[in-house]
Amino acid sequence: MVHQVLYRALVSTKWLAESVRAGKVGPGLRVLDASWYSPGTREARKEYLERHVPGASFFDIEECRDKASPYEVMLPSEAGFADYVGSLGISNDTHVVVYDGDDLGSFYAPRVWWMFRVFGHRTVSVLNGGFRNWLKEGHPVTSEPSRPEPAIFKATLNRSLLKTYEQVLENLESKRFQLVDSRAQGRYLGTQPEPDAVGLDSGHIRGSVNMPFMNFLTEDGFEKSPEELRAMFEAKKVDLTKPLIATCRKGVTACHIALAAYLCGKPDVAIYDGSWFEWFHRAPPETWVSQGKGGKA
């Protein structure tokens, strides 16, 4: 593995609270609430308007995506991403801190962390412990929406961090990349249904290894230590010195694998953006495995 200086992928609630208190939130430091919840459960934007980290803007994953794609939350274009984050007051010189309000401590935040990285932005961090621990520790909140001055952001797609359907299909034969699936075990095996999905069976891409993303987090919602994370990869016989593609249902929780590997010193994990949703609808049936109805054991 090539050793290089990696930007801090995590910041603590204490660090962010001190930065907020010191008035540092502005052009040089932007905070994003990247919460998203399944329809019919919680309303992310409504909760943001009720309370959020002072100075934080709402990052709408439903807006910052390729709306023309038939697949879920696919990456927007370079111009689309640049325009969207520029409207949030983010330039190429901004340190971005992302959090979400999920009960696990982190769910969508690593996806937004990866989006910034795939578009060439190095100075981006996830709030370790998320909004859950921000509230638990008694840090300040506000209902006042953030109105940052628009900024200019130049996006440059780093294609090495992104994999397409065609590349993953080719990898089934070449086996150049290890493939790791971050979904819960039942969905990976095909014994439990995909939530909120019509016409989408559960199962996995042939040859992939299962590492459920929630296992990377402690019960308190913090990221596990690099030592613990390395042991988890080793237990699954995932070699962090070799190329790795992460997948899930729609390219969101796969980013937890990229974050965990980054914390272990591996910054080059690629995400299969279309993930299982695209694979199920496009790939030949012999390329996927499911123990459920209609699947191949």
From Swiss-Prot:
The modification Phosphoserine is found at residue 38. GO terms for molecular function: 3-mercaptopyruvate sulfurtransferase activity; 5S rRNA binding; thiosulfate-cyanide sulfurtransferase activity. It catalyses: thiosulfate + hydrogen cyanide = thiocyanate + sulfite + 2 H(+). Expressed in numerous tissues. It comes from the Eukaryota. The active site is at 248 (cysteine persulfide intermediate). The modification N6-succinyllysine is found at residues 14, 136, 175, 224, 237. Its EC number is 2.8.1.1. PROSITE patterns: RHODANESE_1, RHODANESE_2, RHODANESE_3. Pfam families: Rhodanese. Together with MRPL18, acts as a mitochondrial import factor for the cytosolic 5S rRNA. Only the nascent unfolded cytoplasmic form is able to bind to the 5S rRNA. Formation of iron-sulfur complexes and cyanide detoxification. Binds molecular oxygen and sulfur. It comes from Bos taurus. Substrate binds at residues 187, 250. It is found in: Mitochondrion matrix. Monomer. Keywords: Acetylation, Glycoprotein, Mitochondrion, Phosphoprotein, Repeat, RNA-binding, Transferase. Residues 25-143, 173-288 form the Rhodanese domain. Its main location: mitochondrion. The lineage of its organism: Eukaryota, Metazoa, Chordata, Craniata, Vertebrata. GO terms for cellular component: mitochondrial matrix; mitochondrion. InterPro entries: Rhodanese-like_dom, Rhodanese-like_dom_sf, Thiosulphate_STrfase_CS, TST/MPST-like. Residues 144-159 are annotated as: Hinge. This is Thiosulfate sulfurtransferase. The modification N6-acetyllysine is found at residues 14, 136, 163, 175, 224, 236-237.
